[in-house]
């Protein structure tokens, strides 16, 4: 092998003092420019961060990125870097295996070389003298392919002429071909205007300026003739390996590289930035911790079948010598039922294998020769129209039916059978498939027949599961439940909830899980991490606990505290650098809590010129709802789009900063929302106690004046003293003994006749007639007469009758007068009763009419109240809609996961399980595009909603400060009226204000004066009202009065109410018609203006129609409902006024009766009654004493009788035994 002509000298250290820098010997005065193109390899094969990457391009197999950042796998891990000043004009060979790394500049790696990069390092338009005559690629198949370019189109006979690949700027187009033995196999295209880098991969890819010009079989070595020309150009040859890195591209060239090789660099790669600002950043789930894999299958006795497919290829040459696969190639299936055209799998398992043969022909179609050289080909089966790849059939794909056929009759899909040559793939036949989806047949990589239960379970931990064909990530837990049927159980949305293990009959629950963490980065270093699990991560070993998460940090919590001590007891004194809500992280990694300070804004009164001042009011309570906050949402974009699939994550990086923009928008919105809400709201302990029923009922939380509030009636029944009479000094009532000793007669009396009569008689019956009373001019006496009065008048009547003949009839006059007076009393009582009856009948009828009308109004009021409650229900429904808006948006976002966006499946893992990698990438790209669109719509809706809520929150804060904490002077700000006070209460996602206001019902119009212009001896001065809230006016009595503008309360103005100003001059501002639009601008329709502009510049542009299922923002608007409630409240108020009038009418129907007094008269018993009572007492008392004291065995009579009986009785009685009861049967 020819060696490179390289002369190296050791120069002073450029990139540190660890590795010397090798510079070519002929770098005279241009050494500085050479140093910019040569770097010292850092340990690990990394390129220094300050390297300029002059003429280093991003290798791509598709479109070229012009500008941007992306995370990709590129050959940027340098195993060896050779600075080369010039080449010999003989062929030089470079091999991927066994390369000599003795002349490397800097560190040397022994990794596998993937790509050899040839860089021509120059910054100006340098033109090479000759360049490479030809690039020879020695493939692993023993075939040598040559790549060369020509300055014009050539024929077959011209390929032997001179060709080259010039480096630097080329003159005119150069047409390039792939040659084999001097014969063109493929036309590659034209060279770019300036060739600056050639990179060749061991996998057979040939790149020029980063673009893949040609691909072939794997390559062992590269050989080419090269000269540097007349200019002083400089070469570097880099032996590189693929590694994952964040690459910044400008004008298609690499300008900066960040290796994704460390924890902090991985975060830089995920955020697509080389410099991280101080803050919190999400950590990849792979760095948080890995999960085990669980598989649950049905145990069964398995049988296995091997399906061998033999494909015989026929190859021949074209007119240009290129290989062509014949359509006469044949496919042979295993024999089944004497038929080779269709083969169906009849076992539980199967494995498919392809065997390929190749025959060639020169001129005819009889393929007998072996395929050699360029005609050598291998049969491959490509995906075709089937939703699964042929090479994935043995990867545990399941079917209910699976058949292979050579005929399209009855087929569901087909595979393409192709001949793979050294240059391309050519489809020759089709292999048709008849299948049914199911679980009866499974393709396996090897024979696994027999009785098996291949289930593997990892319980009580986050695991990646495949349960009866349903995949996901969750926690599997054993339960004690018993369900009679079913293998697995899902929710209505299709999520797996649990399953039954048929081997032991145990039911397991499945709970979705996702381990997440946030890294705290300060000055580009990870100082801490917030995580949901207690596990070391990101190289952090010290940790502490909080009520909501674990915190790992570089701060050593174990110095003075116990490891894992709660954060509240650590008392770290430091200044936080980054904050989130009420927590912060210091530069040393310590976690601290932040004290939130509150500040109130200044409130300025508003001056008004209204001279119509209210004189009467009605009180109204008006309700206002204001939304204060929304629930923050954080979405892991890569998890939502790819669900952790590594291949999908690689594809997702091609979308540059899509995920970063989505996550940062939501994160910043959530942080701003959290900070503003936290600074606005705080918890009051007293209010929290009053919110509890137990604490509210406790007298400890109430004002001391209520602690000793007496019970009703005082202690026990002490209050009855206010109900029962306590003074009887005037003897208005008789005692209980008097009620017993006298007969009480109750009658009805006229007015005060009876009381005046009693007071006149003084209890003497003889004064009965003398004390006669007069009622309406008629003489009357009480109708009840006692025995003495009856005796007296009887004697008068008897005396008159007896002495009548003798002229003594006048004695009966008192009797006649008394009888007539008592008859008058009875007659007048009857007349009063008749009048009262008429009054009662008329009043009752009128009352019934008023009551009927009143209840009719009450009925209408109740109806209005019912409709008012319906309006309140609608308002509450809107509040509920505000609460559910975000949930509905998230639900819509989740539903999008079930949409396949025209892919064959919505499951990424299922797509890669069924298709080959290239076809699966195309299908997954559709899912990524659709899901990113759904995420963008959701983020737009969320940000719009947050902006609306942010303005609403500021309004709520202003209303709390002005309406609740003070009394607002602004008319209409705290309710529609003059504000009295307001109460605020919590509501879903916001606050409800109850504004108590005065609504004017009558007004007084006055002529207001802005001030008084006064005249002194030698000067004129002005006086204006000191309090601008007062209105100055002059009344008819020529006195000045002041009244508040909110209520008409005039008072005489005094000198203390005024302040003096300089003069009385008034400045008038005159405006013309031309100046008026600048003062009062015309209404401008912004939408129409924008539409006109767009139509002028883009006449064919149309407004896109965004359906609500993509973007749906809900705005809270309770104005209509509140106005409706106020209208109904006003109507109810008017109804109550009418009811008050009707009640007054009912009150006017109160019957003012002439009461017949209830007269109680006590009549004394006659003398003979008292005599009879005395005789009974005299007789009964001695008899009772005798009976009690003398009788009985202990009495006097009893003792005397016993003595006499014992003395005079001679008969002695014998003692007898007591008689017992005898039963006779």
Swiss-Prot record:
UniProt cross-references to PROSITE patterns, sorted A to Z: COV_S2_HR1 (PS51923), COV_S2_HR2 (PS51924)
Annotated region (Interaction with host ANPEP), positions in chain: 433-577
Endpoints of the signal sequence: 1-12
Coiled coil location: 880-924, 1114-1156
Gene Ontology cellular-component terms listed: host cell endoplasmic reticulum-Golgi intermediate compartment membrane; membrane; viral envelope; virion membrane
Stretches in topological domain Virion surface: 13-1166
Positions of the UniProt region annotated as S2: 553-1225
Superkingdom, taxonomy of origin: Viruses
Complexes and interactors: Homotrimer. During virus morphogenesis, found in a complex with M and HE proteins. Interacts with host ANPEP.
Cited function: S1 region attaches the virion to the cell membrane by interacting with host ANPEP/aminopeptidase N, initiating the infection. Binding to the receptor probably induces conformational changes in the S glycoprotein unmasking the fusion peptide of S2 region and activating membranes fusion. S2 region belongs to the class I viral fusion protein. Under the current model, the protein has at least 3 conformational states: pre-fusion native state, pre-hairpin intermediate state, and post-fusion hairpin state.
HAMAP family: ALPHA_CORONA_SPIKE
Protein's name in the database: Spike glycoprotein
């Amino acid at each position: 092998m020819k060696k490179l002509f390289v002369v190296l000298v050791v120069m002073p250290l450029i990139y540190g003092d660890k590795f010397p820098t090798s510079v070519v010997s002929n770098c005279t005065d241009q050494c500085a420019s050479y140093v910019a193109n040569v770097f010292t390899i850092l340990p690990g094969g990394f390129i220094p961060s300050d390297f300029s990457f002059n003429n280093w391009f991003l290798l791509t197999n598709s479109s070229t990125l012009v500008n941007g950042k992306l995370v990709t796998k590129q050959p940027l891990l340098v195993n060896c870097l050779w600075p080369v000043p010039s080449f010999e004009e003989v062929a030089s060979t470079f091999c991927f295996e066994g390369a000599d790394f003795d002349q490397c500049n800097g560190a040397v790696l022994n990794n596998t070389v993937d790509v050899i990069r040839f860089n021509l390092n120059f910054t100006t338009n340098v033109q090479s003298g000759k360049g490479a005559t030809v690039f020879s690629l020695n493939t692993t198949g023993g075939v040598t392919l040559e790549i060369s370019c020509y300055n014009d189109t050539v024929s077959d006979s011209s390929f032997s002429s001179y060709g080259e690949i010039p480096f630097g700027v080329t003159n005119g187009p150069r047409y390039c071909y792939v040659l084999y033995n001097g014969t063109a196999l493929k036309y590659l295209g034209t060279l770019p205007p300036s060739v600056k880098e050639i990179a060749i991969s061991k996998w057979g890819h040939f790149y020029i300026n980063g673009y893949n010009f040609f691909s072939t079989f794997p390559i062992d070595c590269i050989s080419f003739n090269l000269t540097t020309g007349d200019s002083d150009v400089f070469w570097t040859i880099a032996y590189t390996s693929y590694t994952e890195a964040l690459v910044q591209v400008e004008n298609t060239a690499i300008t900066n590289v960040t290796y994704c090789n460390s924890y902090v660099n991985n975060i830089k790669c995920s955020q697509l930035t080389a410099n991280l600002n101080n803050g919190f950043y999400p950590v990849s789930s792979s760095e948080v911790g890995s999960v085990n894999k669980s598989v649950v299958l049905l145990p069964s006795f398995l049988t296995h079948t091997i399906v061998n497919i033999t494909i015989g290829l026929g190859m021949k040459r074209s007119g240009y010598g290129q290989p062509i696969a014949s359509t006469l190639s044949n496919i042979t299936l295993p024999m089944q039922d004497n038929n080779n055209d269709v083969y169906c799998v009849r076992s539980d398992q199967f494995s498919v294998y392809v065997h390929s043969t190749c025959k060639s022909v020169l001129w005819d179609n009889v393929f007998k020769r072996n395929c050699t050289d360029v005609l050598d080909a291998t049969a491959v089966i490509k995906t075709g129209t089937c939703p699964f790849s042929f090479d994935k059939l043995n990867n545990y794909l399941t079917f209910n039916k699976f058949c292979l056929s050579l005929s399209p009759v009855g087929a569901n899909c087909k595979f393409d059978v192709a001949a793979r040559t050294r240059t391309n793939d050519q489809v020759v036949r089709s292999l048709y498939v008849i299948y049914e989806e199911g679980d009866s047949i499974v393709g396996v990589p090897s024979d696994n027949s027999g009785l098996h239960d291949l289930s593997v379970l990892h319980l009580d931990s986050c695991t990646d599961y495949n349960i009866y064909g349903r995949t996901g990530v969750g926690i599997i837990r054993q339960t004690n439940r018993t369900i009679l049927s079913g293998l697995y159980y899902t929710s209505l949305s299709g999520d797996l909830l649990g399953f039954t293990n048929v081997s032991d009959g145990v039911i397991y629950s499945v709970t979705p899980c996702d381990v997440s963490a946030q890294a705290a980065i300060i000055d580009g270093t990870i100082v801490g991490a917030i995580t949901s699990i207690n596990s070391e991560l990101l190289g952090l070993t010290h940790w502490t606990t909080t009520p909501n998460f674990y915190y790992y940090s570089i701060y050593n919590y174990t110095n003075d505290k116990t490891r894992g001590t709660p954060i509240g007891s650590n008392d770290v004194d430091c200044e936080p650098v980054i904050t989130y809500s009420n927590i912060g992280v210091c530069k040393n990694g310590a976690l601290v809590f932040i004290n939130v300070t509150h500040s109130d804004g200044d409130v300025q009164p508003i001056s008004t010129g209204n001279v119509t001042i209210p004189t009467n009011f009605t009180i109204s309570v008006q309700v206002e709802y204001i939304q204060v906050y929304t629930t923050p949402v954080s979405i892991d974009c890569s998890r939502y789009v790819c669900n952790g699939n590594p291949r999908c994550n690689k594809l997702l990086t091609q979308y540059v900063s899509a995920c970063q923009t989505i996550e940062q928008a939501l994160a910043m919105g959530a942080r701003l929302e959290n900070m503003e809400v936290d600074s606005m709201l705080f918890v009051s302990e007293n209010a929290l106690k009053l919110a509890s029923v137990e604490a509210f009922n406790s007298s400890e939380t109430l004002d001391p004046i209520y602690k000793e509030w007496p019970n009703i009636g005082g202690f026990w029944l002490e209050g009855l003293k206010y109900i029962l009479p306590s003074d009887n000094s005037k003897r208005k009532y008789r005692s209980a003994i008097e009620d017993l000793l006298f007969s009480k007669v109750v009658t009805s009396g006229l007015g005060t006749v009876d009381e005046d009569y009693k007071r006149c008689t003084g209890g003497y019956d003889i004064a009965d007639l003398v004390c006669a009373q007069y009622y309406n001019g008629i003489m009357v006496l009480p109708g009840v007469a006692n025995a003495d009065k009856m005796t007296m008048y009887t004697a008068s009547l008897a005396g008159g009758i007896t002495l009548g003949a003798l002229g003594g009839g006048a004695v009966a006059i008192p009797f006649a007068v008394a009888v007539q007076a008592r008859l008058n009393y009875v007659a007048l009582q009857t007349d009063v009763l008749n009048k009262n009856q008429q009054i009662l009948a008329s009043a009752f009828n009128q009352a019934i009419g008023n009551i009927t009308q009143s209840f009719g109004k009450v009925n209408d009021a109740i109806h209005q109240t019912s409709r008012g409650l319906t309006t309140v229900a609608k308002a509450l429904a809107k509040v509920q809609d505000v609460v559910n808006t975000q949930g509905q948006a998230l639900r819509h976002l989740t539903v999008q996961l079930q949409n396949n966006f025209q892919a064959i499946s919505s499951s990424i893992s299922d797509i890669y399980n069924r298709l080959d990698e290239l076809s699966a990438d195309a299908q997954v790209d559709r899912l990524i595009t659709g899901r990113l669109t759904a995420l963008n719509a959701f983020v737009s809706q969320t940000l719009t909603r947050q902006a609306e809520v942010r303005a609403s929150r500021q309004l709520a804060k202003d209303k709390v400060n002005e309406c609740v904490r003070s009394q607002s002077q602004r008319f209409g700000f705290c309710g529609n009226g003059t504000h009295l006070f307001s109460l605020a209460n919590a509501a879903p996602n916001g606050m409800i204000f109850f504004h108590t206001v005065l609504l004017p019902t009558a007004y007084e119009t006055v002529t207001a004066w802005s001030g008084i212009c006064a005249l002194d001896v030698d000067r004129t001065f002005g006086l204006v009202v000191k309090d601008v809230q007062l209105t100055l006016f002059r009344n008819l009595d020529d006195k000045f009065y002041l009244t508040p503008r909110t209520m008409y309360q005039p008072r005489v103005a005094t000198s203390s109410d005024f302040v003096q100003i300089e003069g009385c001059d008034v400045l008038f501002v005159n405006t013309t018609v031309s100046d008026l639009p600048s003062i009062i601008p015309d209404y401008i329709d912004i939408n129409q203006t924008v539409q006109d502009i767009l139509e002028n510049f883009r006449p064919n542009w149309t407004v896109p129609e965004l359906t609500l299922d993509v973007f749906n923002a809900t705005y809270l608007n309770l104005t209509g409902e509140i106005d409706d409630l106020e209208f109904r409240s006003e109507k109810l108020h008017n109804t109550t006024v009418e009811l008050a009038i009707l009640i007054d009418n009912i009150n006017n129907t109160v019957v003012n009766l002439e009461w017949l007094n209830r007269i109680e008269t006590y009549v004394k018993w006659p003398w003979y009654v008292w005599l009879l009572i005395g005789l009974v007492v005299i007789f009964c008392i001695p008899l009772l004493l005798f009976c009690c004291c003398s009788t009985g065995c202990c009495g006097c009579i009893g003792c005397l009788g016993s003595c006499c009986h014992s003395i005079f009785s001679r008969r002695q009685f014998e003692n007898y035994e007591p008689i017992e009861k005898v039963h006779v049967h």
